[in-house]
Amino acid sequence: MNNCQFTPVLDQIDTLIRKSCAFLQGDLDQEQIELYNLSFAQADLLAARTILAGVEKNPNLTHIANYFVADVITSITQKFAVRAKTYGLEAAELPNLESLQDFLSPEYVSALGQQFLDDGLPESD
């Protein structure tokens, strides 16, 4: 999966967040956890899009961006999957995570760490 392939999945998550926001009533007493999770999901989504934009300017960020974006997508999807109906979602609407697993594997993370040791942290603008 390259960076432009992440975009449709991030768009799918954005749609799920918006659908969940429309479904919930906004009652802090009854839906505090869900609203909290949605606010962090929205922040994580923005961070993922920001790092992908950074890769366009600095390809040295590609490997860390792949890990970060895969982790964001997986984390948000898992939160939705545990209580999909609470968020007004169906399990079939959630992203398929299989294509992201290589970026989250111990081998990928280890290679990323080794790259940091060998080359230092990639500089960004």
Residue ranges and their predicted role:
Residues M1-D125:
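Flavin-dependent oxidoreductase catalytic core characteristic
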